């Protein structure tokens, strides 16, 4: 409900970002950028009403009638009422009567539980329904299975009374442009879903207000002035919240308000207007300001804490439900660029920023570095716990120095002298972080001083860039580490949390710290590693600016929101010294933006810089004319002042020494869950009517080169074990390629359950042959379509219920059989080596009717003895089919030739790169990070990297055919 969404074209941005992201071809549509005019009445130039058309996933086009918001439907006398409206109003009335009838001591706990129930129904209940509808089309499939929208006249609807009730309810609400019988099932399902949403949302809000009433009171010894200020601030926040909701509904209408794009899309242009231009996710961010206004008016910490809990739950709903659906629906990966001929491949490769494989490894000149003008690909990032690498000097020194800082902080006494030292240390690091780093960047912008220094000693610009990232990274972390240490020294644990505003100060301070963390994460997501480290000071990037994420709303989010945490520390500590550090930090940050970033951006991008961000434009439109003129005068005054200070600094700018390094990130341990979940299954009572001989599974796949015979002749076995296997009529072992699709042919009785399913398991997972006691973890396919609410379980069905006459049975039985085929591929496979089996299960349960022959998934190791590893061509030929399997053989992802670049989805979904690096490790014994696969971008480049890595590591590898010591070359 936080965004308006529609199909059609989207409005172009003004072009915005304070630091450009490297190698960004285009700005992807983001949730906050997507708003739709909805299904409200539109008019063309002649004043004639325009229809809104919807489109179902199946391609059906229909007219979307006009609907109204839930409050108008329920409370407006002009709107027609139906039975569901009466039910909702009655339930709301029960809530109000309950508040009136409960004893005083029970009101608060009872309504706290009631509100938490409705909030869980909203975020968990509706979230679960929408998640399943988005991924599996569950709600529509429920409607199809129950046939509640099928006309009873056909004789196929088992619920004719329910059909008439729903028909009357919906047609009462939509008197025009709507026919219940002719509307698509997706639209009718959405309308029924809306009524459930109306009930939950209304009860959620009303129960919250009643809980606030139950908790409300006036603090002891509160003066009249404080009471007036508290109520005034609360009313302002509530009115602001009301405006946000009304303006958001004006923009998105009912279609997006009720998550209509989970069911169908509308053919209409996207707009970017109103509150959606002010803040990201306005319905879930500033749209909850009223909760805190009500908390102020109630003067209750209980209401405040339950408001924070509800707000956090709403953000979880956004992250886990809405954003994944928006990305899937509106931000699909762009179509891949296919190569036309070998010449174009070569030309494209030379222009790429990915590592390029030379024609021969011997042609490389180790002492003649290449000075590429473009930025290097981001493979080994610095930021984030997931990127912590103790083999890297930057990370190791960060952890050691950080540990030292906090050890000194904890072990030293909090005397005035030590407090002074810690505050002075924090101030020095802040000055270095803003002034020192600013001076380095200014010289780099004007004279390329940093890069020139490294080129002077024969290094490349890429090496200068890497060293700069380490310097900036350590300076940043040391700045904040020293600030946290100073806060620790100045903080005194409260003796009484209930005294005065102590608790409120801590809550607000924690909120501001959280805001700064969110702002930093948003900035990093928008800019990437390149923009975060000011990459356009070091490399010539594209002259076009793109604005997305938080930069859609703010030109410099670090100017205010990026320092919210330091002011949160001021609130928590109530210390004058920390207030001084906060003022110093804010002043230096503003100066850095004005004197370092702004001149460089103007020089680099000129007039393409956007003057006003989305929030600024919205505020200017809302201001009266006198205030607009005052705003312009204030801006001019600040500009003149900054120009004067800049001229003064230019005349006497000190040279600051390069600083100390630190950055601490806690190591994260990866815990692998046991890949199976134990379940309790019950044997079906109707199994007696089925003969297990009628069930069978036959497996077919792409054969892999088996190493079994090689292992037998290795000399490690006894004499008898070295002899060839005497199979005595048994079939050859099944060994399939890693990641190749596996076809399963099944047979079952003609009267088999339509909910039968086939699952893929490790042989060692199940000890029982009668019941599968382990979850398939999504690796299963139904035998028949339309039997499950989950549409993904039908992906892979080839044929179903093809009759095999009894005359064609090999076992001589006289009964006809049903047969079918399914194909397991992609996420339905195990992406590892091992021995596996398929199991045929009965009637949606875990009773096993048949088990396939066990088969092995094996990655053939590259034979370095027969084929020289230094030959990239042979490596390419061995690697190419494996890479295609890792990419699911999807034509939009998998390459058709070794030179063709990978599809863009490889960049977005990390599982594909992880599959490839696992295969490379097994084939060649070389371990790469997944980012290497993304950076190389083709089999050709990856093969060259493997050869180069093998050559580098060769002196440390034990060869198969000789000693590890060097040998003389043969003449």
From Swiss-Prot:
Role this protein plays: Catalyzes the first step of the methylation pathway of phosphatidylcholine biosynthesis, the SAM-dependent methylation of phosphatidylethanolamine (PE) to phosphatidylmonomethylethanolamine (PMME).
Subcellular location(s) of the protein: Endoplasmic reticulum membrane
Enzyme Commission number, as recorded: 2.1.1.17
Keywords assigned by UniProt, alphabetized: Endoplasmic reticulum, Lipid biosynthesis, Lipid metabolism, Membrane, Methyltransferase, Phospholipid biosynthesis, Phospholipid metabolism, S-adenosyl-L-methionine, Transferase, Transmembrane, Transmembrane helix
Family per record: Belongs to the class VI-like SAM-binding methyltransferase superfamily. CHO2 family.
Catalytic activity: a 1,2-diacyl-sn-glycero-3-phosphoethanolamine + S-adenosyl-L-methionine = a 1,2-diacyl-sn-glycero-3-phospho-N-methylethanolamine + S-adenosyl-L-homocysteine + H(+)
Membrane topology of this protein: Multi-pass membrane protein
PANTHER family linked to this entry: PHOSPHATIDYLETHANOLAMINE N-METHYLTRANSFERASE
Single Gene Ontology MF annotation: phosphatidylethanolamine N-methyltransferase activity
BP terms from Gene Ontology: methylation; phosphatidylcholine biosynthetic process
Pfam families (alphabetical): PEMT
Signal peptide (UniProt feature, chain positions): none
Coiled-coil region: none
Organism: Aspergillus clavatus (strain ATCC 1007 / CBS 513.65 / DSM 816 / NCTC 3887 / NRRL 1 / QM 1276 / 107)
Full protein name: Phosphatidylethanolamine N-methyltransferase
Main location as per UniProt: endoplasmic reticulum
């Amino acid at each position: 409900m936080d965004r308006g969404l529609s199909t059609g074209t989207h409005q172009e941005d003004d072009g915005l970002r304070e630091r450009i992201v490297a190698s960004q071809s285009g700005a992807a549509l983001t949730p906050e950028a997507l708003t739709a005019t909805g299904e409200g009445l539109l008019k063309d130039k002649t004043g004639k009403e325009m229809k809104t058309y919807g489109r179902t996933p199946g391609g059906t086009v229909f007219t979307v009638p006009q609907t109204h918001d839930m409050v108008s439907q329920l409370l407006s006398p002009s709107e027609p009422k139906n039975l569901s409206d009466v039910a909702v109003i009655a339930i709301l009335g029960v809530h109000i009567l309950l508040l009136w009838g409960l004893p005083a001591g029970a009101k608060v706990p009872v309504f706290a539980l009631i509100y938490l129930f409705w909030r869980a129904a909203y975020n968990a209940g509706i979230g679960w329904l929408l998640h399943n509808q988005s991924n599996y089309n569950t709600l529509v499939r429920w409607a199809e299975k129950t046939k509640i929208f099928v006309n009873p006249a056909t004789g196929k609807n088992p619920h004719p009374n329910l059909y008439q009730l729903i028909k009357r309810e919906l047609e009462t609400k939509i008197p025009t442009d709507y026919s219940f019988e002719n509307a698509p099932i997706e639209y009718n399902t959405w309308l029924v879903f809306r009524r459930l949403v109306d009930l939950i949302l209304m009860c959620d809000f009303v129960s919250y207000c009643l809980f606030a009433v139950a908790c409300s009171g006036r603090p002891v010894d509160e003066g009249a002035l404080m009471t007036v200020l508290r109520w005034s601030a609360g009313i302002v926040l509530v009115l602001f919240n009301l405006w946000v909701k009304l303006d958001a509904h004006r923009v998105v209408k009912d279609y997006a308000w009720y998550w209509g794009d989970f069911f169908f899309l509308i053919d209409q242009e996207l707009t970017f207007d109103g509150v959606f231009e002010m803040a990201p996710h306005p319905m879930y961010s500033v749209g909850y300001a009223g909760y805190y206004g009500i908390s102020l008016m109630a003067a209750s910490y209980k209401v405040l804490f339950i408001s924070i809990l509800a707000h956090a739950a709403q953000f979880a709903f956004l992250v886990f439900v809405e954003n994944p659906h928006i990305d899937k629906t509106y931000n699909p990966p762009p179509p891949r660029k296919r190569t036309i001929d070998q010449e174009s491949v070569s030309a494209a490769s030379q222009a790429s920023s990915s590592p390029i494989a030379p024609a021969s490894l011997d042609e490389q000149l180790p002492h003649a570095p290449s000075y590429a003008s473009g930025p290097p690909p981001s493979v080994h990032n610095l930021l984030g716990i997931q990127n912590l690498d103790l083999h890297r000097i930057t990370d190791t020194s960060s952890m050691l120095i950080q540990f030292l800082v906090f050890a000194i902080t904890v072990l030293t006494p909090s005397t005035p002298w030590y407090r002074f030292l810690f505050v002075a240390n924090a101030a020095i690091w802040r000055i270095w972080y803003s002034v020192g780093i600013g001076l380095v960047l200014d010289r780099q912008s004007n004279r390329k001083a940093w890069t020139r220094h490294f080129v002077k000693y024969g290094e490349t610009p890429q090496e200068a860039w890497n060293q700069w990232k380490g310097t900036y990274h350590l300076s940043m972390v040391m700045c904040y580490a020293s600030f946290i240490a100073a806060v620790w020294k100045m903080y005194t644990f409260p003796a009484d949390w209930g005294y005065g505003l102590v608790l409120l100060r801590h809550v607000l301070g924690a909120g501001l710290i959280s805001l700064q963390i969110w702002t930093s994460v948003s900035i990093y997501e928008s800019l990437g590693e390149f923009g975060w480290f000011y990459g356009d000071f070091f490399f010539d990037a594209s002259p076009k600016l793109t604005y997305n994420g938080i930069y859609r709303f703010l030109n410099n989010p670090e100017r205010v929101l990026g320092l919210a945490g330091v002011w949160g520390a001021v609130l928590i500590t109530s210390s004058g010294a920390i207030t001084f550090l906060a003022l110093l930090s804010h002043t230096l940050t503003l100066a850095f933006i004005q004197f370092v970033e702004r001149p460089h951006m103007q020089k680099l991008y000129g007039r393409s810089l956007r003057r006003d961000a989305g929030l600024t434009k919205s505020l200017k439109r809302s201001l009266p004319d006198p205030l607009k003129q005052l705003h312009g005068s204030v801006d001019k005054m600040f500009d003149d002042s900054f120009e004067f200070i800049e001229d003064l600094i230019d005349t006497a700018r000190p040279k600051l020494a390069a600083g100390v390094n630190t950055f601490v990130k806690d190591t994260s341990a990866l815990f692998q869950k046991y890949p199976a979940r134990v379940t309790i299954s019950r044997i079906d009572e109707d199994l007696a009517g089925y003969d297990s001989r009628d069930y069978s599974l036959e497996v077919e796949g792409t054969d892999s080169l088996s190493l079994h015979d090689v292992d037998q002749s290795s000399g490690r076995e006894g004499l008898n074990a070295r002899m060839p296997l005497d199979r005595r009529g048994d079939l050859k072992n099944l060994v399939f390629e890693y990641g190749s699709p596996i076809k399963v042919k099944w047979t079952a009785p003609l009267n088999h359950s339509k909910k039968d399913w086939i699952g893929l398991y490790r042989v060692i997972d199940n000890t029982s042959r009668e019941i599968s006691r382990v979850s398939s973890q999504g690796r299963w396919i139904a035998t028949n379509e339309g039997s499950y609410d989950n549409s993904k379980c039908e992906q892979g069905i080839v044929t179903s219920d093809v009759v095999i006459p009894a005359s064609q049975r090999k076992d001589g039985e006289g009964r006809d059989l049903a047969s079918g085929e399914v194909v397991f591929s992609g996420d339905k496979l195990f992406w590892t080596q091992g021995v596996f089996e398929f199991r045929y299960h009965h009637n949606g349960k875990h009773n096993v009717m048949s088990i396939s022959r066990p088969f092995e998934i094996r990655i053939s190791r590259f034979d370095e003895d027969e084929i020289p590893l230094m030959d990239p061509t042979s490596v390419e030929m061995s690697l190419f089919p494996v890479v295609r399997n890792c990419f699911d053989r999807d034509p939009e992802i998998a390459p058709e030739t070794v030179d063709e670049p990978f599809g863009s989805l490889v960049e977005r979904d990390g599982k594909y790169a992880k599959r490839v690096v696992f295969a490379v490790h097994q084939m060649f014994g070389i371990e790469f990070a997944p980012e290497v696969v993304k950076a190389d971008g083709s089999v050709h480049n990856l093969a060259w990297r493997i050869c180069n890595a093998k050559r580098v590591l060769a002196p440390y590898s034990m060869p198969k055919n000789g000693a590890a010591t060097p040998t003389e070359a043969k003449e």
